[in-house]
Amino acid sequence: MQLTLWTYEGPPHVGAMRIAASMKGVHYVLHAPQGDTYADLLFTMIERRDQRPPVTYTTFQARDLGGDTAELVKRHVREAVDRFQPDALLVGESCTAELIQDQPGALAAGMGLTMPIVNLELPAYSKKENWGAAETFYQLVRTLLKDQAPAELNHDPKAWQHEGRRPRVNLLGPSLLGFRCRDDVLEIQRLLNMHGIDVGVVAPLGATVADVHRLPEADLNVCLYPEIAESSCAWLERSFGIPFTTTVPIGIGATHDFLVEVHNLLGMTPPSPQEGIRQSRLPWYSESVDSTYLTGKRVFIFGDGTHALAAARICKEELGFEVVGLGTYSREMARPVRAAAKAMGIEALISDDYLAVEAAMAAAAPELVLGTQMERHSAKRLGLPCAVISTPMHVQDVPARNSPQMGWEGANVIFDSWVHPLMMGLEEHLIGMFRHDFEFVDGHQSHLGHSGGSGAIADTEVAVSTLTDELVWTAEGEAELKKIPFFVRGKVRRNTEAFAKSTGRNQIDSETLYDAKAHFSA
């Protein structure tokens, strides 16, 4: 166990809560102390939902531990069933309640209830939120469908051709508190419909128990988020013979590969490679003169496995960036992330320690950071532009507008989100670079009025004149350093300090800066 100020994932019962809150007619009875009810805020504040998650807490207190806590569990289960009348009941325990060993799932199973009961055994001290969500969805699907499994697997994904209907697929994996899941579903539904493919069931987001029962009716399962749905897709393939996709359609190349995979599995003619060029603005920009400014920009990527891998591919193949850091906090996705990093000639960072991530970020000296909410804070401290690509996220990353990451429109959104920080960074640098010119000096009158400048444009970087006991930046040296673009300024500062130490200089002035530049450029 680790004491920390920040965690990328909550305990596994939060993942179970995400599945319950994503679905309709499903209720979750959580054996937990009073302090574990904080999770409600995640849905009402972050997701901005107008309803609380369908969760009943036993909320035992210290004085209850001397009595019969098992009876407390049964009473809350009974009350939840009578009040909410769910179609399926999830029963589990929080990390604190796990220590009591009351086994609430077994208690609920012995109460003679009529609806399906899913006993969730989520090891809170070895697993985390995404695993908990995946395990909950898997156990729910398995509980509801195990009696429908055929004796022999004879599923044919091309059966739609002789049945006189359009092909049908399920979209599996989107959930509440996922990154842009709602918008991704709309975009992928639109994309598949353009190609004559119907979407049968979307689960768990918005699905009912009846929808889960209809999962075997599809020709193909689309695994949109492997962290959540891969185990369920694999079980459906083993039990019903339904194949599933392995390509996540984030980016131009991945979206095309996804469409080719879907069409091949369904026995359809693959689409033209030119479709992405017609549908998205990203390929056009990548071929334009303007994009040459972005070529070779150093990028540090960190997030959940799905979005980190997608970001690395987009950066390398579609935007011409240089990936100098790649990592994930999802240990379940460590293997593919390590493989992708190795292919790019770097070492993957698999960690859930935000301080280790920040240290790696500083060492990589990137010009753009793609990460989670925490990387946004870290990048701000380091003076780097950042775009959020993954959960965990803040409310500002749950826009009311449609803003997908997947499909052709998702490529447009990604293009805006990633390129604008770099472009605006250049603008800020130019303003800072020419701030001493008479046209930029505070007090210079403009055509808008005669009251002078407002002082809105200020130098945001605090100069550190004394870095160590031995090294001192002179005012002249600091002034020269500020003429260097902000996104490489940190690297130049570190290189100059290292050069000054190696040459025995105590003060760093403009001459030292130029000497260091010549040394490292040689």
UniProtKB/Swiss-Prot annotation:
Cofactor (UniProt): [4Fe-4S] cluster
Residues that, per the record, bind substrate: G425, L426
Cofactor note: Binds 1 [4Fe-4S] cluster per heterodimer. The cluster is bound at the heterodimer interface by residues from both subunits.
Keywords for the protein's UniProt record, in alphabetical order: 4Fe-4S, ATP-binding, Chlorophyll biosynthesis, Iron, Iron-sulfur, Metal-binding, Nucleotide-binding, Oxidoreductase, Photosynthesis
Active site: D290
Protein purpose: Component of the dark-operative protochlorophyllide reductase (DPOR) that uses Mg-ATP and reduced ferredoxin to reduce ring D of protochlorophyllide (Pchlide) to form chlorophyllide a (Chlide). This reaction is light-independent. The NB-protein (ChlN-ChlB) is the catalytic component of the complex.
GO term, biological process aspect, one: photosynthesis, dark reaction
Catalysis: reaction(s): chlorophyllide a + oxidized 2[4Fe-4S]-[ferredoxin] + 2 ADP + 2 phosphate = protochlorophyllide a + reduced 2[4Fe-4S]-[ferredoxin] + 2 ATP + 2 H2O
Subunit structure of this chain's protein: Protochlorophyllide reductase is composed of three subunits; ChlL, ChlN and ChlB. Forms a heterotetramer of two ChlB and two ChlN subunits.
EC number, UniProt record: 1.3.7.7
Keyword Iron applies: yes
Pfam families given in the database record: Oxidored_nitro (PF00148), PCP_red (PF08369)
Gene Ontology MF terms in the entry: 4 iron, 4 sulfur cluster binding; ATP binding; metal ion binding; oxidoreductase activity, acting on iron-sulfur proteins as donors; oxidoreductase activity, acting on the CH-CH group of donors, iron-sulfur protein as acceptor
Residues that bind [4Fe-4S] cluster: D36
Biological pathway: Porphyrin-containing compound metabolism; chlorophyll biosynthesis (light-independent)
Coiled coil: none
UniProt similarity note: Belongs to the ChlB/BchB/BchZ family.
Protein name in UniProt: Light-independent protochlorophyllide reductase subunit B
SUPFAM superfamilies cross-referenced by the UniProt entry: Helical backbone' metal receptor
